[in-house]
């Protein structure tokens, strides 16, 4: 994220950490000294911009919903990424330290099974209370996504 000098006179620097587009809005609101709604998933990076703190997120849960076999959920850390395709059940695992371009799906690699199980458990917990029924708290459950979530009527 580039912050212009008219917003903050800071020395350009890189912040290492797991960030995503969802962090832009809360950062901009925070820079404007406006409240960040509690319903926002992202985190403000303002303290990182002013070098007051480092940004630490142990993992990020993301999703892509295409209403096709490509719909997926993922857990990404600084070291690796676990992907689960919610309509097919296909899983992928990438060791981002040794394979930063994600060319080798290591889901079947014996030496990675313990780590894969840990990331799968995190995803199971992230999806547990979702109305789509992707997880019952003990496993991932494949199914077609619902066409309309119940909260759409809240807007």
What are these regions (language model features)?
Residues 1-3, 19:
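Short glycine- and hydrophobic/aromatic-rich loop-to-beta-strand nucleating segment
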Residues 7-10, 22-25, 30-92, 96, ...:
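C-terminal cap/loop subdomain of S1 sulfatases and analogous C-terminal strand-loop tails that border
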Residues 13-16, 35, 107-108:
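Short, solvent-exposed loop/turn segments at secondary-structure boundaries
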Residues 15-22, 39, 113:
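Short, solvent-exposed loop/helix junctions and linker helices
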Residues 101, 106-112:
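Active-site-proximal N-terminal segment of extracellular/periplasmic enzymes that hydrolyze or transfer
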Residues 110-136:
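A contiguous, mid-protein "functional segment" used to position or interact
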């Amino acid at each position: 994220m580039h912050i212009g000098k008219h917003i903050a006179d800071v020395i350009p620097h890189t912040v290492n950490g797991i960030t995503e587009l969802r962090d832009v809005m809360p950062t901009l609101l925070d820079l404007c000294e406006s409240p960040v709604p509690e319903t926002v998933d992202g985190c403000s990076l303002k303290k990182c911009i002013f070098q007051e703190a480092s940004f630490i997120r142990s993992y990020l849960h993301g999703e892509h919903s295409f209403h096709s076999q490509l719909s997926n959920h993922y857990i990404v850390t600084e070291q690796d990424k676990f992907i689960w395709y919610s309509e097919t059940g296909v899983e992928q695992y990438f060791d981002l330290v040794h394979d930063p371009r994600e060319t080798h799906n290591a889901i079947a690699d014996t030496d990675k099974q313990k780590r894969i199980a840990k990331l799968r458990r995190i995803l199971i917990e992230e999806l547990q209370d979702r109305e789509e029924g992707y997880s019952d708290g003990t496993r991932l459950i494949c199914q077609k996504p619902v066409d309309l979530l119940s909260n759409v009527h809240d807007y």
